[in-house]
């Protein structure tokens, strides 16, 4: 295999899909030879889809079934290497090694400002099927890198309690970074197994998303690793894991709640069969028939053996690369009809007077910072200290003692003795008008690029913390001293 060639699509996979698809197989196989689609979803926490189209330097093709979703024409992303479900970012420990380009959406200041997320167009259907509402309790159980989590946060309008969980110890930091850039203020980021969460949150959530780890057949167009890793045994192993995750999700749902089960694979063992087996064991769940929008195929009960539950799987949604934009997805909406298996075990943290005293002291420093550097005071309902970090904790969050978490809410900043240092997350959760001092730079301005590289730039005005933005949207924080703004853009995110 040459250096520029992808490994071949596994022949056993093609033979299997030919058997399943029949006359459709030719169109499906031809679609696998096409370039992957690049999707772009507007961040409605920060701007309207129409405003994004006005700002964007090139055309965007709207998705028929998602107002905030777009497809970026292939000829407008020359040389762009866009991942399947996430922006072109790196973990905080690695700098972004790419020159900025207006023609590559992952290397643009608007991306750094969190105005959009790069996502497979077919993956955008999942959060819409979950349909989270402002004020609800929502869980994304397998949330990294954050494509569906950022969508959920936007649909909730930063109101309610949103728990974004990822079991993988490294990927959870990508999730945290993407939610931070997105401006999610009501998100709690945990790093736990589904079973451990189920022990703590039984019967707690209104909606749960299971975007399950899978064999990744829908990644073949863009991921050489997915082609190399695929085997029939991988499918069976994933199916066993998916069944366990779905069981844990069901335990955490309140009566009348909704679970959306989704994968990016075509394998019926992981899709229809997993659902059918779950339904046969849970008569108190039913599969909901969603509105059939353009390009929405159905589940295929004919691909699995009959039995209890199999008659419902036709209500699932299948999106295919040969029938619409995107790489392909499977999603199903489960409605919980019954009573919870047990009473919810959630609880408020035990009273800790030393912790309360530390929180009061940190809150005083934070409000002093707001008075000196912001145009308004921010008074969350609940402020808590974790180590030296100060958080605005979403109302209704129960005790997390004993659970692994990254952020128990909106990270406001760090308390250092008698001063408060604002976090990047604080800036990304605000509007530029919320800062007492701000600098808004055009997207093509060299000063904006200098800021993203961590360099200072000239700026006259009052000394102090400054909100630095691009075309009116925050990019991060700087500190002005003597006519120069020093960039406080996080070192691990800086452009090179």
Predicted regions and their residues:
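Polybasic, low-complexity RNA-engagement segments
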Residues: 1-20, 26-53, 327-330, 337-496
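Class I S-adenosyl-L-methionine
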Residues: 80-81, 205, 240, 258-261, ...
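A short acidic, Gly/Pro-enriched loop at the edge of an enzyme's catalytic core
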Residues: 133-134, 198-209
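Conserved class I S-adenosyl-L-methionine
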Residues: 135-142
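Conserved SAM-binding loop of SAM-dependent methyltransferases across substrates and taxa
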Residues: 145-158
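Helix-to-beta-strand junctions that scaffold the AdoMet/dcAdoMet cofactor pocket
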Residues: 157, 253-255
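S-adenosyl-L-methionine
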Residues: 167-202
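Mobile active-site "lid"/loop adjacent to the S-adenosyl-L-methionine
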Residues: 170, 206-247, 260, 264-271, ...
């Amino acid at each position: 295999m040459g250096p520029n060639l992808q490994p071949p699509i596994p022949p056993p996979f093609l033979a299997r899909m030919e058997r399943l698809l029949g006359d459709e197989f030719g169109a499906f196989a031809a679609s696998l030879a096409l370039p992957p689609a690049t999707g772009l979803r507007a961040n409605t926490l920060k701007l309207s889809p129409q405003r994004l189209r006005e700002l964007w330097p090139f055309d965007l093709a709207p998705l028929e079934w998602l107002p905030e979703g777009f497809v970026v024409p292939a000829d407008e992303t020359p040389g762009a290497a866009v991942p399947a479900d996430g922006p072109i970012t790196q973990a905080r420990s690695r700098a972004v090694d790419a020159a900025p380009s207006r023609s590559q959406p992952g290397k643009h200041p608007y991306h750094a400002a969190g105005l959009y997320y790069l996502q497979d167009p077919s993956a955008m259907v999942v959060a819409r099927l979950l349909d989270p509402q402002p004020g609800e309790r929502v869980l994304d159980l397998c949330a990294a890198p954050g494509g569906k989590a950022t969508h959920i946060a936007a649909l909730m309008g930063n109101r309610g309690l949103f728990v974004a969980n990822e079991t993988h110890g490294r990927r959870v930091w990508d999730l945290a970074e993407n939610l931070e850039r997105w401006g999610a203020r009501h998100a709690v980021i945990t790093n736990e197994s589904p079973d451990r969460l189920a022990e703590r949150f039984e019967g707690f959530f209104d909606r749960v998303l299971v975007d399950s780890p899978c064999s990744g057949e829908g990644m073949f167009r863009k991921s050489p690793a997915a082609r190399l890793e695929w085997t029939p045994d991988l499918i069976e192993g994933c199916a066993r894991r998916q069944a366990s995750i779905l069981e844990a999700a069901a335990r955490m749902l309140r009566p009348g709640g909704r679970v959306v089960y989704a994968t990016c694979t075509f394998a019926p063992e992981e899709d229809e069969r997993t659902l059918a087996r779950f339904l046969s064991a849970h008569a108190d769940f039913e599969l909901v028939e969603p509105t059939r929008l353009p390009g929405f195929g159905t589940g295929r009960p004919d691909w699995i053996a009959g039995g209890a539950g199999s008659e419902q799987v036709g209500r699932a949604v299948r999106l295919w690369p040969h029938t619409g934009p995107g790489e392909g997805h499977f999603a199903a909406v489960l409605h919980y009809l019954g009573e919870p298996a047990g009473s919810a075990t959630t609880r408020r943290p035990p009273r800790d007077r030393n912790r309360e005293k530390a929180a009061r002291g940190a809150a005083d420093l934070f409000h002093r910072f707001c008075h000196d550097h912001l145009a308004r005071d921010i008074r969350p309902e609940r402020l808590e200290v974790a180590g030296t970090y100060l958080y605005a904790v979403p109302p209704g969050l129960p005790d997390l003692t004993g659970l692994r978490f990254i952020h128990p809410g909106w990270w406001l900043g760090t308390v250092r003795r008698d001063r408060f240092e604002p976090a990047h997350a604080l800036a990304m959760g605000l509007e530029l008008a919320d800062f007492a001092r701000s600098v808004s730079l055009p997207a093509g301005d060299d000063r904006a690029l200098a800021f993203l590289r961590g360099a200072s730039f000239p700026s006259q005005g009052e000394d102090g913390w400054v909100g630095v933005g691009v075309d009116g949207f925050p990019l991060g924080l700087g500190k002005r001293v003597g006519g120069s703004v020093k960039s406080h853009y996080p070192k691990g995110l800086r452009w090179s």
